[in-house]
Amino acid sequence: EGVKKFLEYQPEAVVAVGGGSAIDSSKAIREFALKINNYGKVGLIAIPTTSGTGSEVTSFAVVNDTAAHVKYPLISESLTADEAILDAELVRSVPPAITADTGMDVFTHALESYVSTAHNEFSSALAEKAIEICGVFLLRAYLDGSDMHARKKMHVASCLAGLSFNTAGLGITHSMAHQLGAMFHIPHGRAKAMLLPHIVEFNSDINKHSKSQKEYLPAVKRYANVAHILGLSNYNKVMTVRSLVNWIQFMQKEMNIPLTIQ
């Protein structure tokens, strides 16, 4: 329906205002419409009203097939918006539950891009700052939605994390959350929050690790760095990663995010 309307109207530009789903829909509509009739350059301006997906600065879009219970990720440079406008006033009234879900979406984006095997200095720097902001301001934004300083910080963190994973990519938390959300209609950020502690344990193998630092998996050092950014530490890297898992679960409990899908 969106593609049909687009081709009928033939706009000079598309303004996508909303959360990740609205922005992704606009991206996909423009993409497929111009494949049918490429009548010229059509700009896309993305204005996010949640602090979560970072879709305003990525070359990704996710399309949800509600009948088949499947989410399809689309990836193409042509999906990237031409301009992104960040205004934290647009997230002032976001309810606490959505603030929690989208905030953990930001954190997961930053964490997964940071530990990605495709990371580089630029993506890592962006991810580190987003992680630092989440550690300080996510709970503040959840507890007091009128705290505009926290809102602004989380809005920026969402964009930073989007820029990071657009370069470095994401991990299995993201892909599993797509299918979990599509099948059980769980908000994407909430699904990722529920999965993330288990994925960190799996990727770092902290439940089976030898105490010999020589045998640590590469992900252990990266996860330990994340823990340090959050102000967490312990007497060795494995225990430091364990403190990161505990911090994620603490945030879930503080923001009333379920620990399981039951």
Model-found features: residue ranges?
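N-terminal small/polar loop signature for handling phosphorylated ligands or for N-terminal nucleophile
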Residues: 1-38, 139-151
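Short glycine/serine/threonine-rich phosphate/pyrophosphate-binding segments
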Residues: 21-28, 53-57, 173
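A glycine/threonine-rich phosphate-anchoring loop and its flanking beta-alpha core
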Residues: 31-121, 206, 218-225
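Gly/Pro-rich interdomain helix-loop hinge
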Residues: 186, 190-262
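Flexible, glycine/charged-enriched surface loops at secondary-structure junctions
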Residues: 118-126, 141-153, 168-173, 213, ...
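Glycine-rich phosphate/pyrophosphate-binding beta-alpha loops
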Residues: 52, 159-192
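C-terminal and late-domain segments of enzyme folds
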Residues: 100-160, 164
